[in-house]
């Protein structure tokens, strides 16, 4: 393809749309990151960045964080709501609350909080959904607005700690998820002498569409029904504490792709708010929860991996709907809170690792079968002869299907002992030759050819063995078929020569990335430059900053990867800071209650028993190094 251009690469990988301007492809075919939108001219080539890290002793795979992206996401979301509030003359403000469950890493939380350090009145709070998360935010929320929202199921200790947060100077909203929690709150607040700030989670009838739609609707795991909400109001009235009810919360689910779902959910919840006000409750905060989506595939659609709206449209719809409902009821407009953790964090992190080997289907030249060979092989040779003789376009599909049928029959005959191993191998190579030839002759312009093209792209794709664990670094790709953009980090200035699938290094057949962003759609293979064992071939997995680290598991005892924070200074200098080593072998053994120290003693006993004295020290040293080493592959020499 001689007319290939960088624009073709940008369109082919759809970088312009899913990257939100943070990532791109340079004119030299290198994937770049521009973490600071204020200075878009300052770019880092990810390939060179990774090489610099390796030279500095940071082994791949490495998770690279760009904190300036976090800063931009926080401020752009606040700005979108501020502009919507001004546009619709909304009579209250907006507060962004970060739910730390999305990414609890200290670096991430601190950078999010630091994003508004210069603001006189920060528009930022924190959310906790468990006791450990609450203990964390109690020590960090004062760096922003000191607002803490407590969600999740609660016991007396959780509630007591939340109330202690009020004594520490925080504004802690305890959101009731179950009716039984109210009794505990009333009792603990009385013991501590603290007036609680109560919220309640409404269980809406409306249910948004998406992978997390079970978070909303009448069968939701969380929230109070209309009748239960009225019971809460009655009990608070009886205790002369109705003024404590200050926040209404609802949650449609993470990654809501359709803006109409958001409008409908806000509309229903807005009526809950106004009805509560009319009952005498002092509710003044309207928490829309999560749902603000990330366009993982860049298609701007209603697919589970995308969204059909932008940030401005999201803020405008929430503010507009709530303005109209409050005006209809003649009720004061509440502070709007959102818990948009996925939006804040997804883009800021990219996993960079290396391809350690490939397996390609290379068709061999075949000779006609011997005259005494089974008729089936002669049929396959006839199909190959038709293709090599440039068969009519209309016959291509028929020839392909005949070849597939013949191959299946050959494999069956081999299993019955009626075909030799050599004859089976010949049949497989003949089929492979037919597939390669058909692939080159089919046309995407012919709609009857397209399914066969997709099938052949998958069948003939190279296998790239990539130094990472899907279960540790991209668990949502395995668990819920989440799409993450995947790109080779260099060589994109030339037309891709191959199509490939990415396989991890676990001993599990599920350890494969089976969906790839390709143009304006999702494909089962990825167009890539050819791999060479002579030079490093680096791959980037993008938009992995939300949920993936904390959800990752240690399948095959592959642990946390190395990580690093990278920042571009105002003078354009790249600064690699706070490199954090990933798990060692000893670390992951300890997680599953295996004692590396005891293992070392056992090694010594075995060495003394089986190894000659002059070799013992070297063997023991290698075993010691093995326990201290990275869980991923490092030595390819």
Swiss-Prot record:
It comes from the Bacteria. The modification N6-(pyridoxal phosphate)lysine is found at residue 101. Coiled coil: none annotated. Its cofactor is Mg(2+); pyridoxal 5'-phosphate. It is an enzyme of class 4 (lyase). GO terms for biological process: arginine catabolic process; putrescine biosynthetic process from arginine; spermidine biosynthetic process. Its EC number is 4.1.1.19. Catalyzes the biosynthesis of agmatine from arginine. Belongs to the Orn/Lys/Arg decarboxylase class-II family. SpeA subfamily. This is Biosynthetic arginine decarboxylase.
């Amino acid at each position: 393809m001689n007319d290939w251009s960088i624009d073709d690469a940008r369109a082919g990988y759809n970088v312009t749309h899913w990257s939100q301007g943070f990532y791109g492809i340079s004119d030299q075919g290198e994937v770049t990151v521009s973490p600071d939108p204020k200075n878009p001219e300052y770019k880092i080539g990810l390939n060179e960045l990774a090489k610099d890290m390796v030279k500095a002793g940071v082994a791949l795979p490495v998770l690279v964080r760009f904190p300036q992206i976090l800063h931009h996401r926080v401020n752009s979301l606040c700005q979108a709501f501020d502009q919507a509030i001004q546009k619709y003359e909304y009579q209250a403000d907006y507060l962004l609350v970060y739910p730390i469950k999305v990414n609890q890493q200290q670096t991430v939380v601190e950078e999010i909080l630091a994003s508004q350090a210069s603001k006189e009145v920060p528009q930022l709070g924190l959310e906790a959904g468990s006791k450990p998360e609450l203990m964390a935010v109690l020590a960090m929320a004062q760096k922003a607005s000191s607002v803490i929202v407590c969600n999740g199921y609660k016991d007396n200790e959780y509630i007591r700690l939340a109330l202690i947060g009020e004594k520490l100077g925080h504004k802690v909203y305890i959101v009731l998820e179950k009716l039984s929690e109210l009794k505990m709150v009333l009792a603990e607040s009385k013991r501590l002498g603290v007036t609680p700030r109560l919220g309640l989670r409404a269980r809406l009838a409306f249910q948004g569409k998406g992978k997390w739609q079970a978070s909303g609707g009448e069968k939701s795991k969380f929230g109070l029904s209309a009748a239960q909400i009225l019971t809460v109001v009655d009990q608070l009235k009886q205790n002369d504490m109705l003024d404590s009810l200050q926040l209404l919360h609802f949650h449609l689910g993470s990654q809501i792709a359709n803006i109409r779902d958001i409008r409908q959910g806000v509309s229903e919840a807005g009526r809950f708010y106004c009805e509560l006000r009319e009952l005498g409750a002092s509710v003044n905060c309207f928490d829309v929860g999560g749902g603000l989506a990330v366009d993982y595939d860049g298609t701007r659609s209603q697919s589970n991996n995308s969204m059909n709206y932008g940030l401005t449209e999201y803020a405008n719809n929430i503010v507009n709907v709530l303005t109209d409902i409050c005006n209809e009821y003649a009720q004061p407009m509440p502070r709007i809170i959102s818990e948009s953790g996925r939006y804040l964090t997804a883009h800021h992190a990219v996993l960079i690792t290396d391809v350690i080997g490939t397996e390609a289907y290379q068709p061999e030249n075949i000779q006609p079968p011997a005259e005494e060979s089974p008729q089936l092989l002669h049929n396959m040779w006839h199909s190959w002869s038709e293709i090599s003789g440039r068969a009519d376009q209309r016959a291509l599909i028929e020839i392909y299907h005949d070849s597939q049928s013949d191959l299946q029959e050959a494999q069956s005959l081999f299993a019955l002992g009626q075909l030799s191993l050599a004859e089976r191998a010949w049949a497989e190579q003949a089929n492979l030759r037919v597939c390669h030839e058909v692939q080159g002759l089919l046309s995407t312009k012919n709609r009857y050819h397209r399914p066969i093209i997709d099938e052949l792209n998958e069948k003939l794709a190279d296998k790239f063995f990539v130094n990472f664990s899907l279960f540790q670094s991209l668990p949502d790709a395995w668990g819920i078929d989440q799409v993450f953009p995947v790109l080779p980090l260099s060589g994109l200035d030339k037309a891709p020569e191959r199509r490939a699938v990415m396989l991890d290094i676990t001993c599990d057949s599920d350890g494969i990335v089976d969906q790839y962003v390709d143009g304006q759609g999702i494909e089962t293979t990825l167009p890539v430059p050819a791999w060479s064992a002579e030079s490093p071939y680096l791959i980037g997995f993008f938009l992995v900053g939300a949920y993936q680290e904390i959800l990752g598991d240690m399948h095959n005892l592959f642990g946390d990867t190395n990580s690093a924070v990278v920042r571009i200074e105002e003078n354009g200098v790249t600064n690699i800071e706070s490199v954090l080593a990933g798990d060692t072998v000893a670390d992951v053994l300890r997680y599953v209650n295996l004692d590396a120290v005891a293992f070392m003693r056992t090694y010594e006993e075995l060495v003394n028993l089986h190894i000659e004295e002059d070799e013992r020290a070297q063997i023991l040293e290698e075993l010691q190094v093995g326990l201290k080493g990275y869980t991923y592959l490092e030595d390819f020499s």
